Amino acid sequence: MHRTGTFIIVDGLTGSGKSTVLNAVHDWALTCGHKRFRLQDWKESKPPRFEDIPDFDVYFTFEPTRNWVGDAIRSELSRVDDPYGGEELAHAFSLDRQMQYKRLILPALQAGKTVIQDRGVSSSLV
């Protein structure tokens, strides 16, 4: 049986209240008794695969990640000399996004789970 999950992206400008909304949704999921996975709490260097953490009801993710490609992006974005142009950063974000979707988000949705993400592709388009 094919199950389809729910995918919600919370996006907006810096300071627009994304974290406030996400924290409220997380607290709501907690009071409802849902098992929650927060990518920000993942401590391993490799990004998680769904098959390693399948027992959660709600997955809270974000972009860019803090593993592999996402960690490199964050490191490079913090450089003062900023040697990268917008197109190069878009490619880097795209690779990070693709890895997260293939490893975690799409399998979770196919298993009928809920994924709530802080930022998404719309952040890259602005």
Language-model features, listed with the residues they occupy:
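Phosphate-binding P-loop
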Residues: 1-5
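Hydrophobic anchor at the beta1->P-loop junction of P-loop NTPases
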Residues: 10
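Walker A (P-loop) phosphate-binding loop of P-loop NTPases
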Residues: 15
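Conserved lysine of the Walker
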Residues: 18
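Hydrophobic positions on the alpha1 helix immediately C-terminal to the Walker A/P-loop
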Residues: 21, 25
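Post-Walker A helix-loop "phosphate-sensing" segment adjacent to the P-loop in P-loop NTPases
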Residues: 27-54
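ATP-dependent small-molecule kinase phosphotransfer cores
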Residues: 44-126
